[in-house]
């Protein structure tokens, strides 16, 4: 398969394309992106016949910022009414064998209108795939994706376990907790699930730890720590939710998040303040370089244009400051499903 299809948040197609172009060229793959504004996906076309499939097998999905899902595809498949399954199955015979098949769309209002058609197609597609021998249990880690554009066209692609999301449409859906102070609480919940490895979860998020939440009010991010039994120093001039304060785990300090300094090293620093991204990046680097925290999760609020370039600038700035301070660290950046015009960064000191 020569091309790559990447799912992304609607409105972030150019940023997704800019990132993939840089990543692909760094590995010796060159082509061009087909970008339709607000489509919720991009298609990157390469010159080499097998470039798409080869590239995705070389990528680390967790290092991609704007991609929700990434699959290798060929050209669009035209579908005829009454013959959609047959058209897709014919194309599937040219793909590697797979252990499962997913039927998806972009995350847009227009695409949601296809949900009825997808439900009708799911059973006959799965049965057709099994009957033809395209699905095999031995094809471990290989998945086929039918990406429906409308009732008359679709992409058919393949993904590999080493570089993909394990959630349909690349979306990790979370339920808003009844006691949550604000919907922003879902951002940090998703960030923990995305960034904190399951094997180190108990060590990284342990009852009795202390976290600082800059710009905490009304307590959406603080809530995620409190429900894990972690103490929080909440920094904000605004009011905190009364129920959070009654837990006895929250110390509310009315102060400027950019001026506050902790009295001792804390286990976590989190920040969702609305401020220029470079200013937040410099503040986070200051905390880590000063030894005030060993772990940080924060959001960078992005401009309307050249968002990938802005993220790159922030990361380079932090890298320079931390290198100068002799801090060894690892990081991840992701445009999470519950993020909007922002990306979430996690940095942990080694």
From Swiss-Prot:
Superkingdom to which the source organism belongs: Bacteria
Record-level GO BP terms: methylation; rRNA processing
Gene3D superfamilies: 3.30.2300.20, 3.30.70.2810, Vaccinia Virus protein VP39
Repeat found in the keyword field: no
Presence of the UniProt keyword Transmembrane helix in the record: no
GO cellular component: cytoplasm
Biological function: Catalyzes the 2'-O-methylation at nucleotide C2498 in 23S rRNA.
The protein's name: Ribosomal RNA large subunit methyltransferase M
Organism of this sequence: Marinomonas sp. (strain MWYL1)
Organism lineage string: Bacteria, Pseudomonadati, Pseudomonadota, Gammaproteobacteria, Oceanospirillales
């Amino acid at each position: 398969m020569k091309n790559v299809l990447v799912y992304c948040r609607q409105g972030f197609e150019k940023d997704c394309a800019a990132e993939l172009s840089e990543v692909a060229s760094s590995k010796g793959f060159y082509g061009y992106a087909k970008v339709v504004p607000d489509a919720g996906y991009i298609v990157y076309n390469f010159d080499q016949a097998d470039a798409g499939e080869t590239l995705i097998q070389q990528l680390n999905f967790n290092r991609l910022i704007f991609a929700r899902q990434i699959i290798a595809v060929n050209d669009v498949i035209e579908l005829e009414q009454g013959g959609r399954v047959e058209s897709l199955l014919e194309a599937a015979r040219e793909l590697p064998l797979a252990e499962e098949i997913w039927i998806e769309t972009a995350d847009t209002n227009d695409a949601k209108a296809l949900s009825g058609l997808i439900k009708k197609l799911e059973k006959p597609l799965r049965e057709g795939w099994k009957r033809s021998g395209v699905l095999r249990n031995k094809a471990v880690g290989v998945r086929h994706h039918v990406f429906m554009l409308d009732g008359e066209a679709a992409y058919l692609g393949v993904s590999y376990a080493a570089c993909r999301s394990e959630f349909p449409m690349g979306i990790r859906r979370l339920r808003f907790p009844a006691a949550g102070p604000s919907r922003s609480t879902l951002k940090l919940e998703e960030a923990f699930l995305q960034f904190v490895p399951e094997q180190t979860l108990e060590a990284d998020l342990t009852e009795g730890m202390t976290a600082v939440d800059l710009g905490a009010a009304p307590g959406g991010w603080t809530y995620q720590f409190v429900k894990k039994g972690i103490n929080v120093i909440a920094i904000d001039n605004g009011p905190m939710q009364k129920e959070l304060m009654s837990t006895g785990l929250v110390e509310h300090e009315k102060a400027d998040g950019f001026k506050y300094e902790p009295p001792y090293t804390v286990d976590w620093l989190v920040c969702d303040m609305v401020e220029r991204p470079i200013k937040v990046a410099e503040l986070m680097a200051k905390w880590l370089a000063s030894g005030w925290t060993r772990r940080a999760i924060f959001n960078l609020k992005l401009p309307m244009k050249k968002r990938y370039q802005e993220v790159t600038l922030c990361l380079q700035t932090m890298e320079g400051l931390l290198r100068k301070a002799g801090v060894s660290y690892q990081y991840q950046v992701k445009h999470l499903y519950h993020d909007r015009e922002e990306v979430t960064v996690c940095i942990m000191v080694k």
